[in-house]
């Protein structure tokens, strides 16, 4: 079940500055739109090291949102080699991460509109 984003970390980083929070949301929106297709492409090319590296990078920005389920998917992709996950399992994680990204992207778009 998807829970609403927790922007408290964004406000902490921005020291309450609404304009800065909006900039952080715009960066998050960009990542949510760009990284999932890149992850799918890397998976399709069987570039597993690059996929794990991108999952790590993506996880770093998602960690500040309180999206724990999504963050866990990214951690699972990142650690897929250590955990000996099969290609099928990794593909499922990539698909689920993409679905989560779509949900979050809609929520972020609404938050950006509210701050306009």
Would you name each region that the model predicts?
Residues 9-22, 52-53:
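Short, charged, low-complexity loops and linkers
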Residues 16, 39, 43-50, 65, ...:
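Short helix-adjacent coil turns
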Residues 2-5, 21-30, 61-76, 83-116:
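Amphipathic, coiled-coil-like alpha-helical segments
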Residues 10, 38-39, 77:
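Generic hydrophobic alpha-helical segments
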Residues 58:
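An anion-binding catalytic pocket shared by soluble metabolic enzymes
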